[in-house]
Amino acid sequence: MDRFPADFADFLSPAGRRVLDGKLTLRAEPFLARPDLIAPAKAKAAFALLERVLGPVVKPLDRAIPPESILNQTRNYQERLPKTVRVRTADLDASRGKARDAARATGLETMLLSPSFRDFATALAGRKLTRGFGRQALRYGPGDYSGPHTDHHPEDPAAKDGYFDLHLSFVGGGATRQLLVYAKDGHLSETVDVAVPGLVSAYRLPFWHYTTPLEGKASAARWLILGTFYFA
């Protein structure tokens, strides 16, 4: 595959197309993950295309645990952990740059802007979404992770009461496992393996969650294409 399909609907499996018909939604749950909504052959081809074209232009994002989180602690059980992360990323909304050029060259931008992509997100969210949305690409390599965080943005008027994320996951054969751990009933007790080719994940944010280090061979990689939508 040299290009993503122009219409996101053409990227979907029969089960994925049923989402467009309103057959699947988050309802009351904050999180949903399904491995059967993208056609398997297209998911495999998408990984190879992203590695070849977008792989050389993603940039490292590295936020380690600050030493002050221990050195400045003066009381027992006073731990405070800011969001930590190690991944490679590209802002697909940037007005210019190599990542935006790659997204255009591969047809990824056209597919994400197709009406069926937004319709798919709206169907999963189970409520109306604003027309505009954010787009981002992440590439996890061996040991890359995202630490505990909520994705709560109380200073953003459009997001302070919650918003919706749609994630498309494309995984190479060298990856064996990466868990998403998320909170239920006040505890980080729920897990799902997200190192699954073609996995579609839907998030009604904010809630506590984190992603464990990607496991596998030295060649392991997992791509994540994100769409971030505000509720209308």
Regions found by a protein language model. Name each.
Residues 2-11, 17-119:
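Non-heme Fe(II)/2-oxoglutarate
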Residues 45, 213-214:
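Short conserved micro-motifs at the rims of enzyme active sites and ligand-binding pockets
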Residues 100-210, 217-232:
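Catalytic core of non-heme Fe(II) oxygenases with the double-stranded beta-helix
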